[in-house]
């Protein structure tokens, strides 16, 4: 996997109401207001920006992360699929749709441990590796072990992992998001927490495209114009 280069997300101007009088805040770091106010949520998933309960930049990123999941990601791509569909193997080198769903949960879990718990990449405990290495690495191990589950099984795991991510984001500020990891093992040099989590977001887009292709190749699948 290659981490994508990202530029720092620009802050959004926020409006804070004091005693019924609206005061427009300047765009900027806004260190005096490290957590977005309850009125910061825009009306609708398709309006990206700060979110209540998060620092400004983290909230803006959370809106992107949730848009990917809720509007255009793995949930919509797998809607209505049966267990047989999720277990279908296109060829001997392919991954099943179910395995790709669990792969997204595994990836997010490993980034949680690295960025929230400060665990060096690939130094997880044996217990964690037994649980997550097969869906993380996929290949033969994934093909052999990830099967026999309905869609709810995978969706519930994705939801559980995401809820932990959001809870941890609420505990952190924009300075944490921009913290640089000089010892990052791949991607050509240092990175920061923002880039790591941007990868988690775009990683779902990448595999959602694979899932869409696999869905079109399912036995009995109807032709699609997309």
Language-model region placement:
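Extracellular-facing binding/remodeling surfaces
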Residues: 79-85
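Acidic/histidine-rich alpha-helical segments that form the ligand environment
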Residues: 134-180, 195-200
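Extracytoplasmic/secreted proteins, especially bacterial periplasmic and envelope-associated proteins
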Residues: 61, 69, 73, 99, ...
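Short, contiguous alpha-helical
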Residues: 11-13, 19-22, 36, 41-53, ...
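Second-shell loop/turn segments in exported
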Residues: 57-64, 86-88, 144-153
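C-terminal segment of classical bacterial N-terminal signal peptides
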Residues: 29-35
């Amino acid at each position: 996997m290659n981490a994508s280069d990202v530029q720092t997300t620009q802050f959004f101007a926020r409006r804070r109401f004091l005693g019924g009088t609206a005061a427009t805040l300047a765009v900027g770091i806004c260190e005096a207001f490290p957590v977005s106010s309850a009125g910061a949520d825009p009306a609708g998933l398709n309006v990206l920006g700060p979110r209540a309960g998060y620092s400004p930049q983290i909230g803006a990123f959370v809106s992107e992360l949730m848009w990917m999941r809720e509007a255009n990601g793995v949930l919509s791509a797998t809607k209505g699929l049966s267990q047989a569909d999720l277990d279908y193997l296109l060829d001997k080198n392919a991954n099943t749709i179910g395995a790709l769903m669990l792969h997204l949960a595994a990836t997010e879990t490993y980034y949680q441990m690295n960025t929230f718990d400060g665990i060096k990449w690939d130094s997880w405990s044996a217990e964690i590796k037994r649980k997550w290495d097969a869906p993380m690495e996929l290949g033969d191990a994934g093909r052999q072990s990830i099967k026999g589950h309905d869609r709810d099984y995978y969706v519930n795991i994705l939801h559980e992992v995401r809820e932990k991510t959001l809870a941890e984001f609420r505990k952190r500020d924009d300075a944490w998001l921009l913290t640089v990891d000089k010892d990052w093992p791949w991607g050509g040099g240092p990175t920061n927490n923002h880039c790591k989590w941007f990868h988690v977001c775009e990683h779902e887009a990448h595999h959602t495209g694979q899932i869409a292709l696999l869905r079109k190749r399912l036995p009995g699948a109807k032709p699609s114009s997309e």
